[in-house]
Amino acid sequence: MTASGEDSSYVLGSHEGERDRLQRQHAIWRDDCLAAWQQAGWGAGQRLLDLGCGPGFASLDLAARVGPTGRVLAIDNASAYLEHLQAQARQSNLQQLHTLALDLNQASGVEALGDGQWDGAWCRWVAMFLNDLNPLLDLMTRALRPGGTLILHEYGQWDTFALYPRGAGLDRFVCRCIQHWRDHGGDPHVAQRLPALLEARGLRLKHCRSLMACSTSDAPKAQWLQDFLGSYPDQLAAAGLWSPGDQEELDADLSHAMGHCSVWVTPALMEMVWEKPCISSKP
């Protein structure tokens, strides 16, 4: 997802400015996506789900990966994002790419996907925004065929987001973001809960790795953090969680960072690859 706002409950919004930020975000994290898909063996002719697809930048890459003999179903609840993705798919003649409007907070829609019909499911930055994880996890588990794979990119510890030397403005921003998401029912440390929940549904963890990064101010992942710092204070201010004084202090931290040697540290993003076991036949 990306999350919730004008269309429904997208906490980060689904307006054009946020869509553009998400496009830049996907470009920065794209190599990590491609590496995960490659390791999972996703390729031509497969049937894949993109759960919480947002504007569909990953969906387009998945559609190119499976080719004309495959199928990608991109699922989201933001109509503006789905319309944008549909237009992009038509422009690129990606007839294998389809969309479905579905609220992943609700226990519905499994029937539309069918039981055991999908080779893989991709889910990035979605679980952290959901009030109830059960509908999403149940949908993924039922939709995958035996031997199918689920790839998750979710945060295990969002408050590792930091800038060194430390500044009170950025520290306050991180705390207020976490408060804002929790006020909306989200969990910015959601990956900590996923192993137990998915194991209880019979899935097996095949692979995991940390995608946490630290970098200098001019590196892409530092620029991704700077991009977020330029847009999200408005959301916090609208919620009454951010004042002009807070912004002045954050601006001072950023100005110092850009003029001196500084280290940016991302939130602790985790990659997990899960498999739905094949049903063994008894002799």
Description of each model-found segment:
Residues 151-219:
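Conserved catalytic/acceptor-binding region of the Class I
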Residues 188-189, 199, 206-283:
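Conserved Class I S-adenosyl-L-methionine
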Residues 134-149:
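A short glycine-rich, Lys/Arg-flanked "PGG" loop and its adjoining helix->strand segment in the class I
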Residues 27-46, 61:
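Conserved alpha-helix/loop element of class I SAM-dependent methyltransferases that forms part
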Residues 49, 55-110:
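Class I SAM-dependent methyltransferase SAM/SAH-binding core
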Residues 119-134:
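A short SAM/SAH-binding and catalytic strip from SAM-dependent methyltransferases
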Residues 110-120:
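A short acidic, Gly/Pro-enriched loop at the edge of an enzyme's catalytic core
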Residues 7-29:
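Class I SAM-dependent methyltransferase Rossmann-like catalytic core
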